[in-house]
Amino acid sequence: MSKQTFTTTFAGKPLVVEVGQVAKQANGATVVRYGESTVLTAAVMSKKMSTGDFFPLQVNYEEKMYAAGKFPGGWMKREGRPSTDATLTARLIDRPIRPMFAEGFRNEVQVINTVLSYDEDASAPMAAMLGSSLALSISDIPFNGPIAGVQVAYVEGEFIINPDKAQQEASLLELTVAGTKDAINMVESGAKELPEAIMLEALLVGHKAIQELIAFQEEIVAAVGKEKAEVELLQVAADLQAEIIETYNADLQQAVQVEEKKAREAATEAVKEQVMAAYEERYAEDEEHDRIMRDVAEILEQMEHAEVRRLITEDKVRPDGRRVDEIRPLAAEIDFLPRVHGSGLFTRGQTQALSVLTLAPMGDTQIIDGLEPEYKKRFLHHYNFPQYSVGETGRYGAAGRREIGHGALGERALAQVLPSLEEFPYAIRLVAEVLESNGSSSQASICAGTLALMAGGVPIKAPVAGIAMGLISDGTNYTVLTDIQGLEDHFGDMDFKVAGTRQGITALQMDIKIEGITPQILEEALAQAKKARFEILDLIEATIAEPRPELAPTAPKIDTIKIDVDKIKVVIGKGGETIDKIIAETGVKIDIDEEGNVSIYSSDQDAINRAKEIIASLVREAKVGEVYHAKVVRIEKFGAFVNLFDKTDALVHISEIAWSRTANVSDVLEIGEEVDVKVIKVDDKGRIDASMKALVPRPPKPEKSEAKKEGKHD
């Protein structure tokens, strides 16, 4: 196929899609140019079905530093593992694409997005999402798209689609929404305590823009799309399915209704083992043994799936016996750990998270060097999910995509209420350790994080709580669930996480397994989540009503002073010699910003005071009218040089020593003598003149004799 180009304008920027010129051996490939951002997307599919019990979809978002005209960092000077932002963007693209493949599709699919040029005012992630949908849609891969995504900002009461950098910085909302022509199927958002009504409106505005992009894609697919390949779907034998349901469904139904998680798992596992053993014995010698046993396992999974959904939609009974809008039992505790700067333990049913706070000097902030200009990240929220939290063994090591994503969600939720740098000049790190999990662990980490921040004395604007909402839908009827547990998440249609304060929402995240949900469901889920959020906030506020007025004794104390910008080099010294000497002498940490704000950190207040005195003396300037107790350091014929303080000397001219005439300076002063002087002049070169006589009254002039007076009259 020769190169074909499709052009439109979207959100005020040119949008160009090129097909047929590059990556022609992939099943589908596109180059998307949005503004001056350029993204190459290639989609490929394996020829055979994988043997696993899940759909092996891999979406990558690769940031090439040359795209922003930058050299990679590190001694190797080449791109390495994906950045956190790249990982989050890959997840952002994966989530709306995954539901658009048929049930039972098991061929491996890879969608690789490579950022070739980067324009910070034209969203490369949204170009990559468009390219991913298009590459799949024009290929022979059986993808039931297209989908599209947009970013939505909220500035001065107006919604803006795909905002530029300045608009993003002014926005009260950072929303990414994706979906099909008919419905929304993915949401990711941070917000500055916005009400549910505005969030819902933002979603609808975003979906309207999505429909424009889908119409554009449909034109391209009609022009260059390939016929979809015929692939084998994982399907079970109907007669085998009917037999197992008839024989074992009653036993499995009973097991599913056991309320406690571990007991329920044991009961369902016992039924499954019984069935597997029976069919293993029957088909041990059959040449189709492996396929049959795979089918048996899949049928049992489908039976459990169907029963959980039936109980909720028909009987309005959840696996643990709760009402559809009922939260599991809650517990909260602060100061779980000694020595740390703050800690909070939050428990919701069988989900438990411990959050630990660490405060540090601003010099410890994380430096982010990606495609955007380098910047410092003050707040970090890390989420760890050890396998023991679900009673299993498993992999341990670096954080995976899921842990990075859950950590970022908590970070967005809590960042909205943090004090400004001027109010609280610390770098802040929260680490959420999931100790037990039966669903909604990311939201438990947000609640635990609030407890840790308040216990640690961080003056947050308001406490934040999070809740996960679920959905069971048969296409006609649906049920929205509050505080979903693991089984409801696994077998349900939606995982909709909502975090916020009493004033409004600070973060949203939604993933669904169906092709989309309606505005009505979104509205109902947001309203139900608000009720649950307030219930959790009641518990948090009962545990700790407001942030503590003092930091933990182990937290670094801080003091700040302001110096003139031209004095920064004086404090730092040649090659950092002066500041290193201060740090070595006092044991403090010192940060100096470009505006002359000096922050001094230590757990020892005396050390802070000493460092502050040293810095103050280094930048101290003599001022006209001020009096100093000085020491004579040099004597010349024309006057004496005196040291006012540190390395600051002044000249006391011979005429300024006394009101009477001084013949020789050395007759009056000697080196090492201490005298009081008053500064009378500082010239534009910083040279200082001082006076001794200005500190004593001027003696009266002697009166003239009467004789002279009389003579004068004559």
Curated annotation (Swiss-Prot):
It holds the Pfam family S1. It comes from the Bacteria. Its cofactor is Mg(2+). Residues 625-693 form the S1 motif domain. Residues 691-714 are annotated as: Disordered. Its EC number is 2.7.7.8. GO terms for molecular function: 3'-5'-RNA exonuclease activity; magnesium ion binding; polyribonucleotide nucleotidyltransferase activity; RNA binding. GO terms for cellular component: cytosol. It is an enzyme of class 2 (transferase). Involved in mRNA degradation. Catalyzes the phosphorolysis of single-stranded polyribonucleotides processively in the 3'- to 5'-direction. NCBIfam families: polynuc_phos, PRK11824.1. This is Polyribonucleotide nucleotidyltransferase. It comes from Streptococcus equi subsp. zooepidemicus (strain H70). The gene is pnp.
